[in-house]
């Protein structure tokens, strides 16, 4: 029997994008009948479903059913123009998440390119050796964590400070290090929720990549789809 697992996806939106591509569904005019049926069929067939870990998938299933049922309700001709499309919220989430996935791929490619080069500092007389640049979490996990944080930004109050004009990698790097001077670890969700522009977000990821590569910081995740923490790395010197 073919095993269907959720481990290959980074959350319900990732699965939805997979189904949209597989069944050639227009993301701007989503067929809720097809998408809902295929999503629920997929969830029913998974062999590694753990409610404690994959609860988000079940929440999305109920949301899809809610949207589908709303679309089946008859609309008054007088209010058709004023009625909001029940799919609009889902469509916006999918498009935004798709953009962050693309960003993750771009950053991943940049990371691979940078790993081809190794810098020997002039005052470092130790034996030259390649630094292990493997990450404890993939970039797409960071993107997913950011997306979830943005969804919670109206209910989660940021607990750390972040400069409003953080546009350079140097500024973002300094900001991360300064926050780690005050705390042993930073909740990733709180940190990026305070980012106000996409420029800041990209800059933050680039700075975090550099700090992780030099082992100045490290990241950990206690459970799948749980909060991601930025912590002081082996070479942190704040």
Swiss-Prot record:
GO cellular component terms attached to this protein's record: cytoplasm
Gene3D superfamilies per the UniProt record, alphabetical: 6.10.250.2410, Structural maintenance of chromosome 1. Chain E (1.10.10.580)
Ranges in coiled-coil conformation: none
GO biological process: cell division; chromosome segregation; DNA replication
Any matching Pfam family: SMC_ScpA
Main localization of the protein described in the UniProt heading: cytoplasm
Location relative to the cell: Cytoplasm
Entry keyword set: Cell cycle, Cell division, Chromosome partition, Cytoplasm
Keyword hit for Cytoplasm: yes
Domain of life: Bacteria
Family stated for the protein in its record: Belongs to the ScpA family.
HAMAP family, per the entry: ScpA (MF_01805)
Role summary: Participates in chromosomal partition during cell division. May act via the formation of a condensin-like complex containing Smc and ScpB that pull DNA away from mid-cell into both cell halves.
Subunit structure: Component of a cohesin-like complex composed of ScpA, ScpB and the Smc homodimer, in which ScpA and ScpB bind to the head domain of Smc. The presence of the three proteins is required for the association of the complex with DNA.
The protein's name in its UniProt record: Segregation and condensation protein A
Native source organism of the sequence: Macrococcus caseolyticus (strain JCSC5402)
């Amino acid at each position: 029997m073919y095993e269907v697992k959720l481990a290959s996806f980074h959350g319900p939106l990732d699965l939805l994008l997979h189904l949209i591509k597989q069944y050639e569904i227009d993301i701007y005019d989503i067929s809720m009948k097809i998408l809902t049926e295929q999503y629920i069929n997929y969830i029913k067939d998974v062999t590694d479903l753990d409610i404690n870990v994959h609860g988000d998938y079940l929440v999305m299933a109920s949301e899809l059913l809610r949207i589908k049922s709303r679309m089946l309700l008859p609309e008054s001709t007088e209010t058709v123009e004023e009625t909001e499309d029940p799919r609009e919220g889902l469509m916006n989430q999918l498009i935004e998440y798709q953009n962050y996935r693309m960003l993750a791929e771009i950053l991943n490619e940049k990371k691979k390119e940078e790993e081809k080069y190794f810098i020997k500092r002039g005052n470092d007389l130790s034996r030259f050796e390649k630094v292990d640049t493997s990450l404890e979490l993939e970039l797409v996990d960071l993107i997913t964590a950011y997306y979830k944080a943005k969804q919670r930004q109206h209910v989660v109050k940021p607990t750390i400070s972040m400069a409003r004009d953080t546009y350079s990698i140097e500024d973002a790097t300094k900001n991360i290090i300064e926050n780690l001077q005050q705390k042993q670890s930073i909740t990733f969700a709180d940190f990026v929720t305070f980012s106000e522009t996409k420029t800041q977000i990209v800059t933050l990821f680039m700075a975090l990549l550099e700090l992780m590569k030099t082992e100045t910081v490290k990241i950990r995740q206690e459970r799948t789809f749980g909060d991601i923490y930025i912590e002081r790395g082996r070479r942190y010197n704040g």
